[in-house]
Amino acid sequence: MQILLEDPAKAPQAEALASQLGQTDLPQFALVFTAARLELRKLDEPKLGAVYVDFVEGAVAHRRKFGGGRGQSIAKAVGLKAGAMPRVVDATAGLGRDAFVLASLGCKVTMIERSPVVAALLQDGLARAALDPEIGPWVRERMQLRHGPAVETLLGLTERPDVIYLDPMFPHKQKSALVKKEMRVFQSLVGPDLDADALLPAALAMADKRVVVKRPDYAGWLNEHKPSMAIETKSNRFDVYVMAALAG
């Protein structure tokens, strides 16, 4: 993988990232330091545009301001209500959108990301968000990132989180340009989510209160394990495994 500089002032960060990634055999991709951010570009499909993490502006910021607050399905799924601010581990962080929504609603969220490239994009997005005068204070307090394989990192947690959130990669039917672009980039970057079914037993072993699995509406249960309940949205479903109910 190439690391490119459009902003010479970012040379120290580029050198540090090159050292961190080592020999990553992804010749069709480049990580590009622009003046504004770190971007991932697919060199053989330039029309796909850049993939990057932005918590300050764009769709994520719009959702934070106008997305329905605690009335959102994801908030109900993790059990967020007055007086209850669950500690959440998002074991399949991706570009961090769902983790950011939960943090914006008051949850402390630890993100786990298996891909070193995606983790670098996330780290860059977190660093920029931390400097923002509006969201920076709570981003620094509520969001942290761990890079590593999801199952091993989950099983190695020293404290049991209230909620473990899973959104394993699944082939999308939706034709939205954003989903198509990101899914194509992600699938060629990290490959299929081969350990997706193994995530659920690990999460059930480590969560204190519940495990939430986000699925496309047409997908079956993860690991063919029936949830305690499901919360359905227009195109997705949150399968919720309530630990107290499972224990009973």
Swiss-Prot record:
An example of a Gene Ontology cellular component annotation for this protein is:
cytoplasm
> Can the keyword Disulfide bond be found in this entry's annotation?
no
* Gene3D superfamilies from the UniProt entry: Vaccinia Virus protein VP39, YhiQ-like domain
Q: Report the InterPro entries cross-referenced here.
A: 16SrRNA_methylTrfase_J, SAM-dependent_MTases_sf
Keywords per UniProt: Cytoplasm, Methyltransferase, rRNA processing, S-adenosyl-L-methionine, Transferase
UniProt-annotated binding residues for S-adenosyl-L-methionine: R97, D98, E113, R114, D167
Protein name (Swiss-Prot/TrEMBL): Ribosomal RNA small subunit methyltransferase J
